[in-house]
């Protein structure tokens, strides 16, 4: 899944990642036990969270503009999560989407985590994207890395996050809110890593300046976070930075039935749908709200997109 994505908001994302980069899902929740029957626009609107992951692909910008404008007119999208890559000086898609009036959560790519002068990196990113207030520092950092490249432990990440936090508070006070890396939403790895991050770093930080992030594709599995989120992290806001299901026919049901669970179990203030477009083939395709964007204006829209926008 997106496994990639300003004053700084450090949010720890606790569920899964994405195609072509940090954003890419690792698990999906099947609402198979939910009541049968069609989902109404009112049911979707009542549970939907107006946030979505967007890949920064300039080749499909016309379709992006069209789809995001439709969602914006319907009042269904207020913000997007987009990845800031280390191999590009500036991403024009991030700039364009931000200029449309959307709040951007900038996901600082995992590639940046190995820069020796991380403070200088942060300074450059702040300068390049002055319009961004929320910045997520990495995504599922211990699992979404090149198989033959460098690796990072949660202990090393905690030290790095603390460096960035201290730099932002001293050099850029009030500039950004930092969002922690996304913790995995399934199994024990995510809760264990978040507990370590809390002990080593978050307990010593201002909850008004940091957001905890979780990637949650299987809401039934996130109950393991409840003790931590109602205990040591009870003062911190929580964002689910990736969620969704890889089945267009079940997307609306997932929003209706699973989004309330994410709010209940995780205290989720926001849920970012994964993803607007996850490529036309591959593991992320069926999470998409649109497909075949190069066919604009005749690109495909998912049933959930239709319910959200009122388009057939």
Per-region residue spans from a language model:
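Distinct, well-ordered alpha-helical segments
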Residues: 64, 90-94, 118-126, 186-205, ...
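Bacterial Sec-dependent N-terminal signal peptides
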Residues: 15-42
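Aromatic-lined carbohydrate-recognition surfaces of secreted/lumenal glycan-active proteins
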Residues: 160-194, 214-216, 236-246, 268-278
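Substrate-binding cleft of secreted/luminal carbohydrate-active enzymes
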Residues: 247-312
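Active-site groove signature of glycoside hydrolases
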Residues: 122-154, 178-187, 240, 271-273, ...
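Boundary/entry segment of secreted carbohydrate-active catalytic domains
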Residues: 32-86
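An active-site-proximal structural segment forming one wall of the substrate-binding cleft
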Residues: 112-137, 153-171, 192-208, 260-263
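Aromatic- and acid-rich polysaccharide-binding/catalytic face
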Residues: 106-108, 133, 139, 181, ...
């Amino acid at each position: 899944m997106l496994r990639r994505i300003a004053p700084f908001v450090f949010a720890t994302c606790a569920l899964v990642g994405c195609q072509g980069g940090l954003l890419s899902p690792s698990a999906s929740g099947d609402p198979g036990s939910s009541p049968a029957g069609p989902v109404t626009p009112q049911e979707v609107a009542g549970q939907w969270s107006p946030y979505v992951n967007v890949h920064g692909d300039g080749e499909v910008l016309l379709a992006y503009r069209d789809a995001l404008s439709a969602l914006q007119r319907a009042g269904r999208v207020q913000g997007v999560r987009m990845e800031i890559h280390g191999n590009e000086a500036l991403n024009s898609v991030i700039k364009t989407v931000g200029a449309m009036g959307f709040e951007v959560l900038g996901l600082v790519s995992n590639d940046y985590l190995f820069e020796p002068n991380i403070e200088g990196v942060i300074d450059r990113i702040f300068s390049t994207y002055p319009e961004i207030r929320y910045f997520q520092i990495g995504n599922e950092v211990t699992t979404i890395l090149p198989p033959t490249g460098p690796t990072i432990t949660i202990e090393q990440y905690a030290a790095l996050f603390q460096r960035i936090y201290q730099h932002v508070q001293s050099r850029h006070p009030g500039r950004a809110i930092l969002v922690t890396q996304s913790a995995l939403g399934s199994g024990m790895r995510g809760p264990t890593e978040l507990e370590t991050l809390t002990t080593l770093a978050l307990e010593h930080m201002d909850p008004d300046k940091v957001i905890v992030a979780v990637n949650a594709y299987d809401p039934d599995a996130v109950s393991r976070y409840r003790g931590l989120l109602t205990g040591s992290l009870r003062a911190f806001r929580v964002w689910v930075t990736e969620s969704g299901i890889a089945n267009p026919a079940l997307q609306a049901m997932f929003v209706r039935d699973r989004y309330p669970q994410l709010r209940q179990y995780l205290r989720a203030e926001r849920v970012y749908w994964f993803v607007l477009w996850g490529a036309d083939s591959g593991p992320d395709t069926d999470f998409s709200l649109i497909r075949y964007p190069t066919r604009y204006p005749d690109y495909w829209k998912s049933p959930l997109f239709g319910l959200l926008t009122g388009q057939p």
